[in-house]
Amino acid sequence: MRGCLQLARWLRAAPKCPAASLLKPPSGLANPARFFTTSTACWASRSRAPASQPSSDLESRIAAIPIDRYRNFCIVAHVDHGKSTLSDRLLELTGTIQPGMNKQVLDKLDVERERGITVKAQTCTMIYNHNGEDYLLHLVDTPGHVDFRAEVSRSYASCGGALLLVDASQGIQAQTVANFYLAFSQGLELIPVINKVDLPSADPERALDQMEQSFELDTESAVLVSAKTGLNVQQLLPTVVEKIPAPVGDVNNPLRMLLVDSWYDSYRGVICLVRVFDGEIRAGDQLVSFATGIKYFVGEVGIMYPNETAQSVLRAGQVGYIFFNPGMKRSKEAKIGDTYTKVGFEKVVEPLPGFEEPKAMVFVAAYPVDADHFEHLEDSINQLCLNDRSITVQKESSHALGAGFRLGFLGTLHCSVFEDRLRQEHGASIIITPPSVPVKLIWKDGKEEIISNPAKFPEDEELRGKISEIQEPYVVATLTLPDEYLGKVIELCESNRGVQKSLEYFTSTQVILKYELPLAQLVDDFFGKLKGSTKGYATLDYEESAWQTSNIVKLQLLVNKAPVDAVARLVHYSQVERLGRQWVTKFKEHVDRQLFEIVIQAAVGRKVVARETVKPYRKDVLAKLHASDVSRRRKLLEKQKEGRKKLRAVGNVVIEQKAFQAFLAK
């Protein structure tokens, strides 16, 4: 009560002000419109203070550049040929970042810096002055590994050309060939670039000859650079300006915008990377999605420069980011390849074709180490899937490991990187099963069914009788290698059920070998074996081929005749004995001894293909006996033997979870 009286006296004593003056923003505020804001916007600006205020100098320069002086391009190459290092040099050359203090600026994930590879395609806007005129350049740094081909193909949708980068010391490699044909099929203007010309082993002439013979590219305009030292990098940007066409679009048409990528921010929710094809977009505009029909208000627009830098407008031809206010409620609403337009223009604007999402071909099961962390693991997986839509997720449960997920990936590296990101970015402790591939069941009534979970594989004799055939996926693998290792590589491919398709020399010492291989063999550490056979000199690329009839069976691990469902796998019959022996030997190492015998078996149906036994603890029941008391001795040993039989009949084997973790670890 006393507090209320004091407040009333203070209000009476305060100077009287007109009500209108109370609505004026504080003097000196740069943008009065931003004075009143929702709590979401407050959090957004607080979470990224340096980027929330648009740079007036930068905006005025961009506004003065017409669309015919825009250039959208990407860098494509084989893994480890220097794409990210070249991106750094281009950013330094255009003044986007300070020189000398940067290393792989566009590799933003911890796993990318740790492994030295690019996993996510990253974008950056640059301004380059050429012959007295400003050009707006948009650069995409793409991954080189085959597992991230979807990232590369999506990047092409926002580009008019590409720098085709080749290592001067290694020449054309398997993924150089694959990336070339992918870019060529999209109609991109390709500029050949030879990197690492400063190396003692560099042979630029050989690399240029390979590009001319293999790709029929005009190498007269090729640029020879060293991204590490910056040699000749300044010649690249004039070539980009002169060779790569400007994007097509009209700022006066209704908005037509493509969602290229998305990621999650703790405060702002889903942030979308977009390419504007027509019209323009500003904060406050109301948009509608063609895929979901949901309407959103735009909270902020901006460009990557190289980090998020807010702008007042994104125009036709530009690539930038947007987020909504209020934000997207569910991450599934951000569909990669979706078209957005302003509300009211849905019937006028034609949606863009979008992307063909690749199918997951490698499957693993993931379980939390602690069952109480299941919900945290689910949230972590959903957030990472927002940024990588090629991953498939299904819930499943195991008697041994509890509730978990069956995850589908494009390849084994894709799976390994996802596992690292879960641990590094979300602190998840997980158990991952070995990778497996789907199989196709063709029933006698003509129905087809693809299964990726071994638990759904029919084992009942009656059900098996209704199956006409079982098929597994095959791939066509392209291998490049020095000819001195040709014999070993052919032997490796043949032992992995491969069928040779072609063999050609593209130089006097380099061979391109094509093999049709089962995908199951490819995910079983084929790449590691290939590197071992060639001392690291071979490269591998592959593409899906077809489904082929195969003798697929379900291999199970049994502990005292009880199956361990989390470890079951679908394998070719020829691999059963090798894999079964490997399983029982490894599992025996991690199982603690019990008071009774533990029998570990690998079995296909009722047929046991391998067995190991964990001996029980044995109590010395003869310790107190006299050596000459033979009948008493025999009686005690018989009693111990009977007790063991009874214990084995009624006792359950307790396998600690750490045993499964150790067994499933690579």
Curated annotation (Swiss-Prot):
Mind telling me what this protein is named? Translation factor guf1, mitochondrial
**Lineage, opening ranks:** Eukaryota, Fungi, Dikarya, Ascomycota, Pezizomycotina
> EC number(s) on record?
3.6.5.-
* Organism listed in the record: Aspergillus niger (strain ATCC MYA-4892 / CBS 513.88 / FGSC A1513)
What is the membrane topology noted in the UniProt record heading this document?
Peripheral membrane protein
Do you know which Pfam families this protein is assigned to? EFG_C, GTP_EFTU, LepA_C
Q: Does the keyword Hydrolase apply?
A: yes
Q: Which segment is the transit peptide?
A: 1-43
Q: Which reaction does it catalyse?
A: GTP + H2O = GDP + phosphate + H(+)
Q: Which CDD domains match?
A: EF4_II, LepA, lepA_C
